């Protein structure tokens, strides 16, 4: 009887010990809702003390495990190792694509951050084909390149390119500010960069002459549009080749609700920029956060993808004409709704959010 009771006590203590360890440890199951709830209500300082004082050996093992994972990730990224290789067919069976994924020597996207997107912004990376090379820039301004033919191998064998972006970023909090796009044309590399100065944060374009050893970026285009609220997610920043000697550049509305429909402001616009004289022209207005941009020259068609409010993402077609500036409706028309966390009274006063676009003189999205 006593023996069975002792065994039961040992089992209960072991279960409680394991459960408590899973709550205070850093290597917990991020999908377990019960553990997530308990971790929220237990102060992190208390959890750390428990780990350091009571769970000394398990804590050291856990730290060692996490460290080994980090070292392995670094080694994989440093070598540019292939970790996924699969051939897939289109739904109609007419096309086949070979999908490959490689590790890169940059911080990775943390899918557990959810809507804390500002923390993920530094982990977004951008690539561009540059002649027979592929250039990659991290959100924090690290630049590398590798031969295009290396995607057929097991390793990218990338090489680092030094640059002066650290000097450009040094005045900013890197979590919130950084690269938003990478574009190459005619021996020049262009970067759209979210940065800040005494007026607030803004989106600008920098340019550097192609150099595989060192890139010296200089300010190419200054938007002179600043956020009025300090919120830095609706920035746009896409660069795309356009007609003649021009590029297209998308600028988010930067929380400037009253400026989006004004032709005297660049907030919420897609513009063209002449690369020689920097002359800018409005191409379309009424945008919230245009981050996808493509120019189909044969059709004279500008395609842009738009991040709207909840349920309001759009694909927009603009058959370009010099005689007309197209209007896509924001913030008057949108098929989205305010997010639950947003002030509905503010929305009602500043944003109309009519569902129809055409009824109010705007272009309807092709898809939303």
Model-derived features with residue positions:
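Beta-rich, blade/repeat-based domains predominating
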Residues: 118-131, 171-186, 228-246, 285-301, ...
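Beta-propeller domains
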Residues: 94-104, 132-167, 212-213
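Beta-propeller fold detector
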Residues: 100, 152-168, 214-224, 281-284, ...
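N-terminal Sec-pathway targeting helices
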Residues: 1-14
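Beta-propeller domain segments
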Residues: 66, 72-73, 80-107, 114-117, ...
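Asp-box/WD-like beta-propeller blade repeats and closely related beta-sheet repeat scaffolds
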Residues: 176-177, 199-241
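Structural motif
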Residues: 142-146, 198-207, 267, 311-317
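Conserved beta-propeller blade signature
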Residues: 133-137, 188-192, 246-250, 301-305
């Amino acid at each position: 009887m006593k023996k069975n009771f002792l065994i039961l006590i040992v089992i209960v203590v072991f279960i409680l010990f394991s459960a408590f360890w899973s709550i205070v440890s850093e290597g917990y199951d991020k999908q377990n809702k019960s553990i997530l709830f308990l971790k929220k209500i237990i102060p992190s300082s208390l959890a750390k003390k428990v780990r350091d004082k009571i769970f000394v050996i398990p804590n050291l093992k856990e730290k060692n495990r996490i460290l080994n994972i980090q070292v392995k990730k670094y080694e994989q990224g440093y070598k540019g190792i292939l970790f996924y290789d699969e051939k897939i067919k289109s739904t109609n069976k007419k096309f086949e694509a070979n999908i490959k994924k490689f590790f890169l020597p940059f911080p990775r996207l943390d899918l557990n951050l959810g809507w804390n997107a500002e923390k993920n912004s530094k982990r977004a990376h951008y690539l561009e084909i540059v002649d027979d090379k592929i250039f990659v820039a991290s959100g924090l301004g690290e630049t590398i390149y590798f031969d295009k033919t290396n995607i057929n191998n097991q390793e990218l064998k990338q090489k680092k390119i030094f640059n002066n972006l650290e000097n450009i970023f040094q005045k900013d909090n890197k979590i919130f500010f950084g690269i938003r796009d990478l574009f190459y044309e005619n021996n020049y590399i262009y970067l759209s960069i979210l940065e800040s100065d005494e007026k607030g944060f803004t989106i600008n374009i920098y340019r550097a002459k192609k150099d595989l050893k060192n890139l010296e970026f200089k300010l190419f285009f200054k938007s002179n549009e600043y956020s009025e609220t300090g919120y830095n997610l609706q920035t746009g920043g896409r660069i795309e080749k356009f007609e003649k000697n021009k590029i297209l550049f998308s600028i988010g509305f930067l929380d400037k609700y009253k400026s989006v429909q004004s032709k005297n402001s660049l907030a919420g616009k897609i513009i063209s920029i002449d690369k020689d004289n920097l002359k800018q022209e409005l191409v379309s207005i009424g945008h919230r956060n245009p981050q996808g941009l493509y120019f189909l020259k044969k059709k004279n068609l500008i395609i842009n993808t738009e991040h709207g409010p909840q349920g309001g993402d759009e694909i927009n077609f603009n058959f370009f004409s010099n005689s007309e500036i197209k209007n896509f409706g924001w913030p008057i028309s949108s098929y989205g709704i305010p997010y639950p966390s947003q002030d509905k009274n503010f929305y009602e006063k500043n944003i109309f959010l009519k569902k129809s676009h055409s009824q109010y003189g705007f272009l309807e999205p092709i898809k939303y």
